Amino acid sequence: MNATAESTAQPSSAPGLFWKAITALPRDGSFRFSVKFGIAGILAVFAALFNKSHEPTWALFTVFVLMVAQYIGAIEEKSILRIVGTIIGGLVGYLLTAAFEQDPLIYLSLLGLFVAATNAMFGQARYPYAFLLCGMTAVVVCSNGMGDPGMSWEFMIWRIQEVCIGVLAVLLVQSLLWPRYAADEFLTGLRGAFIDLCDLFSATRSGTPANGVAIEARLNQLRQLLRFGGRESRYFRARIETYVELLSVISRIHGAIRPLTGLGLKNSFYFENAGQQLAGVQEAIEAQLALLGAPKQDSGALRQGSLAINTAMQALKQTIIDLRRDPRSRDVELDDILGISLECLSLEEIHQELARGLDLLDGLPVKIKKRHALDLRGLVPGMPPAFWITNGIRSTISLIAAMVLMNWVQPPGGSMMVLCSWLFCFLLPISPEGRGDQRAWHVVVAAIPCVLFLCLGLILASPLLSSYAVLNILIFTWMFVYGQVAYRTAGVSTVMNISMMGLVGAMGLNAQEPVSFQAIANVFFGISIGTVIAAVFQRSLWPLLPQREMRDRFQEMLRIQREALVSGTPSLEGVARLSQLPGEIKLRLANLVRPVYSEAEIQNLCDLLDHLDRFTANRIWESDPGQAKDGLALTKKIRELFAEILEKIGVSFATGRPCSVDATPLRAAIVEFDAWVLDARLQMMSESADPSVTTNLIGRAARYQNAATNLMAAAEVAAQLDTALYSKDNAL
């Protein structure tokens, strides 16, 4: 009877499940984003065609670029920068073409200098997108007006007009249809960060593997949302300083949790006698983190949670005081002493940061602050890094080569070829896959057949292209799929770049005019030849390769750690980079080519990264337990030995020579340091010092010992690496 009922109920539930899935789609973020992507594309092309624009493809290109920025604040910023960059770049392109087109040497030299400079400035922090659009618009105007300088003025006007149409289409769709506000998502992400901390703390307590990388990724995302949210709301902007401090609180809590991983107190004297009190503190902290991550925060409950942590901490301190009277406490092993002190220190730091975070939440400003006088120094662009300078020069050489080829040989699709040769050479190396230029020729081999199939399809479907219904279906479908990929990708991947140029090229076949075979051939040869030219210069001039990128990031990590040890504290930028570098290195490790890099070599690199990351987690530059003169001398000596080992590993990466580190002096210094710690503990016990003072000193000493263990392990692994491989170009 029951079986029969179940069998008859199952088919009838299928339509219900299908309907439930359909009705859930509008609540899915990727579906919403993809629908908006498609509608914005249709709207931009419709407006351009309705306006009888000469190049509706530029409006579509604008939609592709702007829609990737999913938040209102980000889109508004990029829209303004795109319009400003387009106007300036268009004027420069027009003036160069009108004045110097008849003198190719001067013309190409001036254009090359301008594009190289704007490309390089894309790599600094002040309105980089405007610089990119300056260069891109100058390239478009010059490549289209090269054969007819008198038309360059019209190309400039058309370009500006089409960009404005695309910007308006994106702003309209993003503002009216499921708008996403960075300010709102920041607050949601902030609560999510506390939930991540709660999960990490819980996993650390239970001894299960924990994903601390997720917290660093979320913090990086929150910093971006903070910037965009400030452009959306004056109310949010008034609270930015407090939100920055809250992100600092989250980062420091994460830093306090990390050293707790792998602590073994299961059978220690302190765990047996103070385990219940330790568990009480841990449970109170975990509950407070969960409250901070709740959708609706109750100020009263948070204050009660803070009081519960404080009560539990006092109970733990009293238990430790009572245990001092136990004669067995004087015979406890050093590892157990360091372990319990490290745990108590970390718990105390978490408690302090939680209290600070609660005060920040209670003290959020309600009134909007008055604006201060504008600091003009903040508007001056910075100096771009060396990579962006070389990348700008390289992509400009690719551009000039394509323009010379266009002028002398006049291949089909010349203007598309020029744009692709510059765009692919400049942007494909920084795609989020982390491969750089390693597979530039793979891209050529894959892209040409794909573009060929696209053009064959356009030839077969050319009668349908005059139908606006078919055109709209094609645009919406293509951009919907593109939106699905863009929603899940941090940045614009190689495949996304090529597919974008493919659709832009296809839409260049204006449906208001008969589509000829030659027009379709121009799309194929323009993209194909441009991809080949870009690949030639990608692989021959300063190629960006994952092994070199990995090597450089290891060197950067070692340098920041060494500078922090010498100066006593890293800069805010240095702290941020130390949190970002492990993820960037792992991305490059995944792209190392086998069998050039053996499995053992890659595993050693992973182990080295893990040891260096754990060394960072101990925050030695913030932990100086030496209070007496002899203690300060010992910690200074240990930090100098740390810096020496870090420097030797860095030199090995820089020179390609084997890493040779003698860890004997560090081991001897740690033994001497341990003896000093034991003496200092006994002295403080005899003086009945406050447990907070004792755990603070010995807990920081434990971090020194952990850091020494991690660094010596890193040196052993580094000695097994073939660092000469990381400077070579091993795979074309």
Predicted regions and their residues:
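A transmembrane helix-and-boundary motif of multi-pass membrane transporters/channels
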Residues: 1-239, 344, 355, 359-600, ...
